[in-house]
């Protein structure tokens, strides 16, 4: 049985409103105005349209689910996949990852087993790829399966960041540090991580002003170190972003740019044409220190540093960890910050 995107039993979770009027849906995170704002910045534009942190939800007892995708495109040369979570009677989640979709483009059907039996109605959540883009043309379940709509979730955590927040470079949507802590803290989240983005307050204003947020985390600054011209503006732009966050959030956390191997002259010498040398490492260190000094003037902002090991082997491409590294990031943040009881459901 194939359900079209217009079927009300399918619930789409995305920061932007979902247009169900056509035979396909794209789960968008950012409004068009942000694309216009960042025009000319090649890195961010390639990542703005990903459906990182977006999902399809339904209640079913089908033993399998097929996600029908079209116009699947890959923007980075790393493995990408979708993933399925099935809620268990005790409230935990059984997880299933797809194979690597990087080997496919265009029209792709992804079959995911649920392990469910007839009459065993459970909440199922299908998570979209972290970096690749696609439209959803439908979801299929077994012909005799029962299907109901899953209650919508109101997000209570806004995660603002760059490629580390987006999840570069892990294959599974479940492996990003945001997803790990979303489940641990029981805080439905909007993941607004954008690989390559600078500290751009106006790119996130719309999200911060969308509602009152119990928690906002910000993990930006590394990309300001790529050029000398963007180092000096980092602290001032951070202050503008923090002012916006404090006006719209109960708790604000800033994760400073983590250590990079190039700061010690280690790791690869370049990343997609960008030099990873000591000069670049020195600029990132300067940005980190400038942020530390400026953010110290905000007593209510929790500033967290050094969330990743100083070991170049954790960063295969010189900048990003794999799933194990994201687990370490999540563990470190959880050990040093706890959302208030009012935030956690």
Where are each of the predicted segments found?
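N-terminal secretory targeting modules
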Residues: 1-157, 265, 271, 275, ...
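Histidine-centered active-site loop/cap adjacent to the catalytic His
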Residues: 315-345
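Substrate-gating cap/lid alpha-helix
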Residues: 264-305, 328
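Serine-esterase "nucleophile elbow" of acetyl-processing enzymes
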Residues: 126-195, 203-212
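Cell-envelope and extracellular/periplasmic
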Residues: 190-197, 217-227, 257-258, 288, ...
């Amino acid at each position: 049985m194939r359900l079209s995107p217009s079927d009300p039993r399918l619930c789409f979770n995305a920061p932007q409103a979902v247009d169900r009027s056509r035979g396909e849906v794209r789960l968008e995170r950012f409004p068009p105005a942000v694309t216009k704002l960042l025009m000319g910045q090649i890195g961010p534009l390639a990542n703005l349209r990903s459906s990182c942190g977006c999902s399809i939800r339904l209640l079913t007892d089908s033993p399998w689910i097929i996600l029908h995708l079209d116009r699947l495109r890959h923007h980075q040369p790393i493995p990408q996949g979708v993933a399925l979570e099935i809620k268990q009677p005790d409230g935990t989640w059984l997880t299933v990852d797809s194979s690597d979709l990087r080997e496919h483009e265009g029209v792709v059907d992804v079959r995911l087993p649920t392990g469910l039996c007839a009459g065993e109605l459970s909440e199922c959540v299908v998570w979209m790829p972290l970096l690749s883009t696609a439209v959803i043309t439908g979801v299929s379940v077994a012909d005799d399966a029962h299907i109901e709509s899953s209650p919508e979730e109101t997000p209570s955590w806004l995660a603002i960041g760059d490629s580390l927040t987006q999840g570069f470079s892990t294959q599974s949507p479940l492996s990003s540090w945001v997803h790990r802590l979303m489940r641990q803290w029981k805080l439905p989240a909007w993941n607004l991580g954008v690989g390559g983005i600078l500290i751009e307050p106006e790119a996130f204003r719309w999200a911060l002003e969308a509602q009152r947020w119990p928690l906002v985390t910000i993990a930006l600054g590394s990309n300001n170190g790529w050029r000398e011209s963007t180092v000096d503006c980092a602290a001032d732009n951070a202050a503008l972003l923090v002012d916006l966050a404090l006006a719209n959030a109960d708790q604000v956390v800033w994760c400073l740019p983590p250590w990079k191997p190039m700061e010690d002259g280690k790791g690869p010498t370049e990343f997609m044409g960008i030099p990873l040398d000591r000069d670049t490492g020195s600029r990132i260190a300067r940005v980190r220190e400038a942020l530390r000094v400026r953010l110290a003037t905000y007593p209510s902002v929790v500033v967290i540093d050094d969330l990743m090991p100083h070991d170049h082997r954790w960063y295969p491409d010189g900048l990003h960890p794999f799933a194990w590294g994201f687990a370490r990031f999540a563990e470190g943040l959880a050990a040093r910050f706890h959302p208030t009881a009012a935030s956690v459901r």
